[in-house]
Amino acid sequence: MQDILGSVRRSLVFRSSLAGDDGTSGGGLSGFVGKINSSIRSSRIGLFSKPPPGLPAPRKEEAPSIRWRKGELIGCGAFGRVYMGMNLDSGELLAIKQVLIAPSSASKEKTQGHIRELEEEVQLLKNLSHPNIVRYLGTVRESDSLNILMEFVPGGSISSLLEKFGSFPEPVIIMYTKQLLLGLEYLHNNGIMHRDIKGANILVDNKGCIRLADFGASKKVVELATVNGAKSMKGTPYWMAPEVILQTGHSFSADIWSVGCTVIEMATGKPPWSEQYQQFAAVLHIGRTKAHPPIPEDLSPEAKDFLMKCLHKEPSLRLSATELLQHPFVTGKRQEPYPAYRNSLTECGNPITTQGMNVRSSINSLIRRSTCSGLKDVCELGSLRSSIIYPQKSNNSGFGWRDGDSDDLCQTDMDDLCNIESVRNNVLSQSTDLNKSFNPMCDSTDNWSCKFDESPKVMKSKSNLLSYQASQLQTGVPCDEETSLTFAGGSSVAEDDYKGTELKIKSFLDEKAQDLKRLQTPLLEEFHNAMNPGIPQGALGDTNIYNLPNLPSISKTPKRLPSRRLSAISDAMPSPLKSSKRTLNTSRVMQSGTEPTQVNESTKKGVNNSRCFSEIRRKWEEELYEELERHRENLRHAGAGGKTPLSGHKG
């Protein structure tokens, strides 16, 4: 029976088609055939075991949908609003992106196509799994909307964090950028372009882990539709690459441009170009000039170089996400400031440790060998720079330089040096060979070559050396084993150091002259007139009017002065205004002459021109002794604790 009906139907369909082709009157027959076909289709007797070859295959049923409930509004996405939801079966929190469906019949076909695109996208994203990618769970279509169920990430987006906390420090930027590149690398390896990377689409959880979200503009890239690539423009203008704005076709490199713009957003706290242009003006500017956004000046050199690699105007010259993960800005490996000195001690043929030497102990021994009384002069040098010399085995006497040796500069922290007492106690305990080896004044005749780095610090400290030592340093004159560094505060002083000390003595005497001027007596004025006969008495305050009476003449001035002369003068000549006892002590010092001082030029001329200098001096001393005796008698009468002003005994 079924075979008969099938043959009748086929014959009727064939005849109706022939009648239609011939254009004859077959309207009644065709209508009759159509009624038979419709009745057969509506019948449930199952006439056909297989569908006709021209009909599409039946669509597979979707997996059971998730039972969920919509909660509060938490944000707005690219295609609609985002709500918080809950899985009613597991209690898991969800993020539900709701896309409204337009009810208008005019845009019905366009809306249905857009919905199919989103469904295909979510079906694709359900297969992705990565720590830095938001997990998609599925879609649920309703009468007026399409709901996309996603993993809920607490904490908010990067843009919301920038509004709350301001711009991020560079360590935070590095951490977020590295995770962003890891997620983007995973997407690109799976043939997916994000095409809308920005701070608002990067979510951060409470542990600082970021997730790439809002793949509303992403698309499975098996082929780029045409040879020129994708032709649609999606995304936000401030983060758009020039090729996206110009619609010349773009690929994964457009996401790299957006990564660079996102780094600038995190560093400044604002979208790129937002301070210079509005959105429409930014589109025109980027499309016309292909310029990258301004790079903040306070970023590190590695960060600036990273941005330049991301924001190259030529898409083919931008680095991929995999290559950017190896950039020093992301890895944290800073470039060496001095690449020429990167060789370590062990890379050289004969490391210095084989000689039983230590750099710090060697420098400490150099400091201990100095003959100064303390480390004060050493500390004034600032930092001690020396050259680490790698000795080599040779038949010739001494050590030399090799081509492979490196000149590593060492800066010694003065806190590591021993204190003054240990230096003083260890001066005599140092080995003669060690002193000889590390004597910087010796030339190549010793077993070590000496090299001074001509840096500003060393040149400044070299001025503290004595003249004959500086000449040895420049001309390379060899010195004996006992030669050592001697600074300006040492016990042995040269004639060149005499000038500097002379200036200090003059300033000290000028200060004391002002004090003695207040206690001028007729006896002192008489002595001054005898010492300076050509200078009027009114010019007393403009010259060094006082000089100790026991100073020798110019022929007796010593060539070398001990280093303790300043301290002796300061201790022996206190201010005479304090008490009469100090005045007496000052008078005794003026007679004793234990510490010689320098005589100024005006006094020298006065001594040479005065023929009766010795007689006047003897007379002055006698009168001074008489005045002192009268003062002692007054003190004895007044009592042991009595104090009588010196002004009461004038005349």
UniProtKB/Swiss-Prot annotation:
Belongs to the protein kinase superfamily. STE Ser/Thr protein kinase family. MAP kinase kinase kinase subfamily. GO terms for cellular component: apoplast; cytoplasm; microtubule. It is found in: Cytoplasm, Cytoskeleton. Residues 582-608 have a biased composition (Polar residues). This is Mitogen-activated protein kinase kinase kinase 3. Keywords: ATP-binding, Coiled coil, Cytoplasm, Cytoskeleton, Isopeptide bond, Kinase, Microtubule, Nucleotide-binding, Serine/threonine-protein kinase, Transferase, Ubl conjugation. InterPro entries: Kinase-like_dom_sf, MAP_kinase_kinase_kinase, Prot_kinase_dom, Protein_kinase_ATP_BS, Ser/Thr_kinase_AS. Interacts with NACK2 and MKK6. There is a cross-link at residues 108, 110 (Glycyl lysine isopeptide (Lys-Gly) (interchain with G-Cter in ubiquitin)). Pfam families: Pkinase. Residues 68-330 form the Protein kinase domain. It catalyses: L-seryl-[protein] + ATP = O-phospho-L-seryl-[protein] + ADP + H(+); L-threonyl-[protein] + ATP = O-phospho-L-threonyl-[protein] + ADP + H(+). ATP binds at residues 74-82, 97. Its EC number is 2.7.11.25. It is an enzyme of class 2 (transferase). One of its GO terms (biological process) is protein autophosphorylation. The active site is at residue 196. Gene3D superfamilies: Transferase(Phosphotransferase) domain 1 (1.10.510.10).
